[in-house]
Amino acid sequence: MALLEVRGLARAYYGVRAIAGLDLDVAAGTITGLIGPNGAGKTTAFNVISGLVPPDAGTVHFAGQDITGRRPEEITRAGLVRTFQIARGFPRLSVLENLMLYGARQPGEGLLNALLGQGRTREEELFERAVATARRLNLLRVGNNPASDLSGGQKKLLEIGRALMTDPKMIMLDEPIAGVNPTLSGQIGDHLLSLRDEGITFLIIEHHMDAIARLCDPVIVMAEGRKLTEGRFADIAADHVVQEAYMGKRAHVP
């Protein structure tokens, strides 16, 4: 059953179509890959689905809800969260502080919380969750370090950790291993497989085909703002239409 359903999604910038009639489904409990040549519309699709930019046409349904055009924070509360290729955290805050900041339903410093004594309890709960998340992602040893001190791979892990702190049903990852050394890339892949086995669904944009082959089934290929084809990685890689799209030849997208 599809957890995410996208139908007829379209978005243009200054008259240039970035996505044009995009249809895609992401089944619950999968790691689905989203690949395609540069300019295929992958990041625009992420931006529209996650509410960063409104669609010109089309619909997005998640977990049975119509989330088309909703604000990003509303979509996150519904259980769908995305990460970015370039980390968007708070570089001067520590790793644990970054994680706590993204915790679901974090209370403010309101008078009611102070009177009832609940603010501190919630802060302690968030801290415990942040520690558990950092430990899981092998970030606890740098938990008190500023996020700006992390390596590129550690920043990718922190992006995943922040997403986990929102209690997501599904995470959209934008190039989670770009610029990461092979050892840490493998570790990130291990984390994603483990999280999938625990019930979290993923949609991943990635240009490293080894990672796509290892992690993703199915794989969706985009070209010219639409879905070109979908299937197992081995079949996708052998498809001459996909090969032509990557080599810059004009692919026929029905």
For each predicted feature, which ranges?
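Glycine-rich phosphate-binding loops of nucleotide-dependent enzymes
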Residues: 2-254
